[in-house]
Amino acid sequence: MATTTQTTTNSLPSGAGGPQQLVTQMLNHTAPHYTFSFTPFLQRTYQHSLPADRPICKAYASGNCPLKSHCPERHVTASSQNTHGGGNTFSGGFGSLVCKHWLRGLCKKGESCEFLHEYNLRKMPECNFFVRNGYCSNGDECLYLHIDPLSRLPPCPHYERGFCPLGPRCDKKHFRRKLCLYYLAGFCPDGKGCKEGAHPRWTADKDMEKPRAKGEGDQMLLQQQQQQQQQQHMGDANGMGGGMAQATGANEYMDRERERDRDNREREMMMQGRDRDGGGHDRHKDRFGGGGGGGGGGRGRGGWRGRGRGGFRGKGH
């Protein structure tokens, strides 16, 4: 056992200083700095990847810098270094936003402006039109900052608790924070008022939703939209079928009504014909009295002649 302990102790790197320093090294790990062949061109032409704390060019502040864009120092106007009171710099100095009026050449404050008068892509103000409407008519030519809506995703509860199984594939945002070493060791005496670092929030697994990878939410939303469209199409088809059935029933009803009207008209015409025939005999009876009946009997042989008094004159008389 003693030999094993000695071996474990010797396996630690020299100058580690114990587990606490190892944890500090892991949490404060910095990526190596890479230099490419085109890095000087980017720094010289676009002032790219230059340190933000580099000194200010005094020659440019006085009005003329012979190096111009090749100068390794910062070229800032006097408005970026405004002072207030006893020489204290404004909170808006180099860490503030670029003046939106200066971008258009319309800033009236000049050197007294509390915003930056320099073209710095990292300090550009946010485009209000893009924030309100989700798009900007100026497109890529807009001078203001267009923030991707995906960057406003809610924080990942699994990552805040300490670990997210999906890693960079998670559809929620992962905010990197410096952990409190005391809390990581097991106890922080300052509690919620700790200023040494973040305290990961612990939430029970049953109270947390399952993490989803990027694109899964869009697929679920697409499936729901497809189901809604299918239901809508089915409803439209049922509505068309019901409308056709109603139209067919209405046509059949109209046909039956037409047939009924036709039968009624034929029946009325037959009744009118019968009434007309019966009405002729009645007229003869009324006009000729009782002799009409006898004449009717003798009409079969000779018929009647004339409309005189005596009635009929046939062959039998």
Swiss-Prot record:
Keywords: Metal-binding, mRNA processing, Nucleus, Repeat, RNA-binding, Zinc, Zinc-finger. GO terms for biological process: mRNA processing. InterPro entries: CPSF4/Yth1 (IPR045348), Znf_CCCH (IPR000571), Znf_CCCH_sf (IPR036855). Residues 1-20, 202-317 are annotated as: Disordered. Residues 289-301 have a biased composition (Gly residues). The keyword Cell membrane does not apply. It is found in: Nucleus. PROSITE patterns: ZF_C3H1. A zinc finger (C3H1-type) spans 51-78, 93-120, 121-149, 150-177, 179-202. The keyword tRNA-binding does not apply. Residues 302-317 have a biased composition (Basic residues). Coiled coil: none annotated. Transmembrane segments: none annotated. Pfam families: zf-CCCH (PF00642), zf-CCCH_2 (PF14608). One of its GO terms (molecular function) is RNA binding. It comes from the Eukaryota. Residues 223-237 have a biased composition (Low complexity). PANTHER family: CLEAVAGE AND POLYADENYLATION SPECIFICITY FACTOR SUBUNIT 4, CLEAVAGE AND POLYADENYLATION SPECIFICITY FACTOR SUBUNIT 4-RELATED. Belongs to the CPSF4/YTH1 family. This is mRNA 3'-end-processing protein yth-1. It comes from Neurospora crassa (strain ATCC 24698 / 74-OR23-1A / CBS 708.71 / DSM 1257 / FGSC 987). The lineage of its organism: Eukaryota, Fungi, Dikarya, Ascomycota, Pezizomycotina.
